[in-house]
Structures are given as C-alpha cells and as structure tokens.
C-alpha cells in the first residue's frame, strides 16, 4: 500500500538505562549480555571494558535468562530467593531489582501494544510482516533470540529482524546524496502518525502484554 504509518511508544527510559537502579547507556563498560547457568551469572560488557552498569540490551538478555531459569513467574514477580535482593550481576555493584523488572514490563508492553496496533491499522496480520528493522545503539547490541525470549519482539518475527545500526545518520547520508530529494520529501508527506493514546484497543493490549 502507498504511504507509511508511524507511531511511538514511551519505552525509552527503561532501555536507555535512565529508570534502572544500575542503568547506563550503551557505552563502553555497559553490561550488554547476561548468561545464567546452574545459578551462576556470567556477563559481557561493551568493548570488554570494566563494568559500569547495565544497558537496555543487557536488561533484555538478563530477563530472558531469568525467565528460562524460572527466577520469575509469568507476572514478572521474582521467586522468593531473589525477591528481596534481586539478581546480582556483580555482587554489591550491579543488580537487577524487582522495580527494574516492572520498568521493563511497562516498556515492553508499550512496544508490543504499539506494534500490534500499527500492524492492524496497516491492514496486515503479524505473520504477514516481511521484516522487523531495529535501529540505534540499543538495537545494535540486542541479542534477537533473547529479545524474543524476554517477550520484547514476537517470536514469529525473530527470524525476520534486520539490525540497521545508526539509521538516523545513514538516512541523512542517503538524503544528502540522493538525486531525488523531492521524491524523499513526498514520501515523508505521505506518512501518517498513529497516536496510541487515541486507539481504543491500546489500554487492553498494554495490559495483556504487561505479563509474560
């Protein structure tokens, strides 16, 4: 179909580290990947630098592993063993608390509800989507299998994800170098924004996706 639909979901603070107890942006030293095996926690930082906090991709990775290890239930509630102290990535320094998980659940619910509504407004079903493109620092660090495991993206789309990197800069370069800048401007003019707050189904979808 001609034109584009766009929307936005209020999920940035959780994935940018701003609302996390030990959060940080996707900078050198940020914990980007977490693995849990037999109760032991291992991690990897960006640039293999000394750990300074956990970024959005690290949170997604940790929650996927915590779900797999049955450290939380389908409501996101931590098991009794971890309820008070959370999951310690680095004891005494970097921890994922119950409050952090709740922040993730809100962000995840906003994204999944927004995606469902956007696809529905376009007249498609989720299984008909050919590609899911992720951009930015958060997307470039994300483990797609773990993003599906943490419920951030639909499992049926996991194999169709494309990582774009810094799409803003790439897009500007394309525009500057394009011989058809007017055509690009016309494409932008045919873009329609979907305001999620005005969508009757948003609240129900948000609540549905709040649980795993």
Predicted region positions:
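Helical "lid/coupling" subdomains associated with nucleotide-phosphate turnover
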Residues: 1-212
